[in-house]
């Protein structure tokens, strides 16, 4: 394994300030890398988002087992650089750590996938199979013009993907200790409670919507969402993310109060039931309200199969332990590929520094991740 090339590529990607949905030359870097490996590379632009679809096979006339790697080049905003020990887009290596925004989520994994693939093709130039990449710059943002649009195009072309590895940071305490094979759904709501504005010294002449909402919040947080326990996912849960009014004077009660919340839901709690439970509470409290809903993702679950078994064995080979299969955490682009009937796993770096100031990846983990990816390719493609 060419580890110096791995570190150099990861640094080059991290040094691009690709805050979502801007890829900021990352896709050109990756396209050039893949073209040197004789990949067929296609750049797909949808509105403000650039996506990359690429594939490589040795024998074009045969139907091949296809292994797809999915990743994203966009990152979340690093915030004020003064809070970072090193510039967030420096890609600096210090004390065996590669520093920078995206080191974990997920430019490190992208570099690991690419170098693993390059080493595999170099070692097995006449392999029978197909390796593909789908890379977007719109995963951390809206996701509207990213992976989902590319998948729609692939379905229209009758592309068949057997296996898919998403490079999201799935690991927790040790690299490879967790493989994700599904995620809960995500439903966001913005609730507006209507009152009437007035002077704080004369509450009898106004209806303070902040006071009105307080009794209902306790009921909201104590909803029994799941009528039976899911064997695939964690329980459905709600989190209130913001409560605010647009009024700034301390001697005036506001006309409205706005509450933002998010529900992560499993297969035992439907979207319709979530809306009904929440509407029932505010109706029961006789509050004048309206809710704007946004569905970000429905739950997805990928039944463990050949890819999962191969990944488990690859991790056991290098780490000497067996990983856990989980469906915890946030949403991922794996849900779009799962619609194609593809076996999907998420396997990547440790997630302890995801979206945090001073994000970094241990170089030992980066090298190990690339080695695990390469062994998965070998065991899936060569042993058919």
Curated annotation (Swiss-Prot):
Database matches in InterPro entries: ArgE/DapE_CS, Bact_exopeptidase_dim_dom, DapE_proteobac, Peptidase_M20, Peptidase_M20_dimer, Peptidase_M20A
Please give the Gene3D superfamilies that the UniProt record associates with this protein: Zn peptidases
Q: What is its EC number?
A: 3.5.1.18
Source organism's superkingdom? Bacteria
Q: Would the keyword Signal turn up in this protein's UniProt record?
A: no
Q: Name one GO molecular function term.
A: succinyl-diaminopimelate desuccinylase activity
Question: Where does the sequence pass through the membrane?
Answer: none
Among Pfam families, the record links this protein to: M20_dimer, Peptidase_M20
| Co-factor: note | Binds 2 Zn(2+) or Co(2+) ions per subunit.
Q: In which pathway does it act?
A: Amino-acid biosynthesis; L-lysine biosynthesis via DAP pathway; LL-2,6-diaminopimelate from (S)-tetrahydrodipicolinate (succinylase route): step 3/3
Q: What residues bind Zn(2+) 2, as annotated?
A: 105, 140, 355
**What's an example GO BP annotation here?**
diaminopimelate biosynthetic process
Question: Reaction(s) catalyzed by this protein?
Answer: N-succinyl-(2S,6S)-2,6-diaminopimelate + H2O = (2S,6S)-2,6-diaminopimelate + succinate
Which keywords appear in this protein's UniProt record, sorted alphabetically? Amino-acid biosynthesis, Cobalt, Diaminopimelate biosynthesis, Hydrolase, Lysine biosynthesis, Metal-binding, Zinc
Alphabetical list of CDD domains matching this protein: M20_DapE_proteobac
- Cofactors demanded by this protein: Zn(2+); Co(2+)
Q: Which sites bind Zn(2+) 1?
A: 72, 105, 168
> What positions does UniProt annotate as the active site of this protein?
74, 139 (proton acceptor)
Subunit-level organization: Homodimer.
Q: Which family does it belong to?
A: Belongs to the peptidase M20A family. DapE subfamily.
**Function in brief:** Catalyzes the hydrolysis of N-succinyl-L,L-diaminopimelic acid (SDAP), forming succinate and LL-2,6-diaminopimelate (DAP), an intermediate involved in the bacterial biosynthesis of lysine and meso-diaminopimelic acid, an essential component of bacterial cell walls.
Q: What is this protein called?
A: Succinyl-diaminopimelate desuccinylase
Task: List the source organism.
Answer: Blochmanniella pennsylvanica (strain BPEN)
């Amino acid at each position: 394994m060419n580890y110096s090339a791995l570190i150099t590529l990861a640094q080059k990607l991290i040094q691009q300030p690709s805050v979502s949905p801007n890829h900021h030359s990352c896709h050109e870097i990756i396209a050039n890398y893949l073209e040197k490996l004789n990949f067929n590379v296609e750049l797909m632009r949808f509105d403000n988002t650039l996506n990359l679809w690429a594939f490589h096979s040795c024998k074009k006339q045969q139907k091949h087992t296809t292994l797809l790697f999915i990743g994203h080049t966009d990152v979340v905003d690093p915030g004020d650089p003064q809070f970072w020990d090193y510039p967030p887009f420096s890609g600096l290596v210090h004390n065996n750590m590669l520093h920078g925004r995206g080191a974990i989520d997920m430019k490190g994994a992208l570099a690991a996938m690419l170098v693993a693939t390059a080493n595999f093709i170099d070692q097995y130039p006449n392999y029978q199979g197909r390796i593909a990449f789908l890379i977007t710059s719109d995963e951390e943002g809206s996701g509207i013009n990213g992976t989902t649009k590319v998948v729609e195009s692939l379905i229209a072309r009758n592309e068949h993907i057997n296996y898919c590895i998403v490079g999201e940071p799935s690991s927790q305490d040790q690299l490879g200790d967790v493989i994700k094979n599904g995620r809960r759904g995500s439903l966001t709501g913005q609730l507006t409670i209507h009152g009437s504005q007035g002077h704080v010294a004369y509450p009898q002449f106004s209806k303070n919507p902040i006071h009105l909402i307080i009794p209902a919040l306790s009921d909201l947080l104590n909803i029994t969402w799941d009528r039976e326990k899911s064997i695939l996912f964690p329980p459905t849960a709600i989190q209130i993310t913001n409560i605010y009014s647009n009024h700034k004077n301390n001697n005036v009660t506001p006309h409205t109060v706005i509450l933002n919340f998010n529900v992560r839901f499993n297969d035992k709690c439907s979207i319709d039931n979530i809306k009904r439970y929440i509407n029932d509470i505010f109706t029961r409290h006789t509050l004048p309200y309206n809710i704007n809903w946004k569905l970000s993702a429905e739950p997805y679950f990928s039944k463990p199969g050949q890819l999962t078994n191969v990944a488990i064995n690859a991790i056991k080979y290098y780490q000497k332990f067996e990983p856990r299969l989980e469906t915890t955490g946030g949403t991922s682009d794996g849900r779009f590929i799962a619609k194609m009937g593809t076996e999907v796993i998420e396997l990547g770096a440790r997630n302890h520094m995801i979206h945090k100031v001073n994000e970094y990846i241990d170089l030992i983990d980066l090298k190990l991740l690339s080695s695990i990816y390469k062994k998965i390719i070998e065991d899936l493609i060569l042993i058919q």
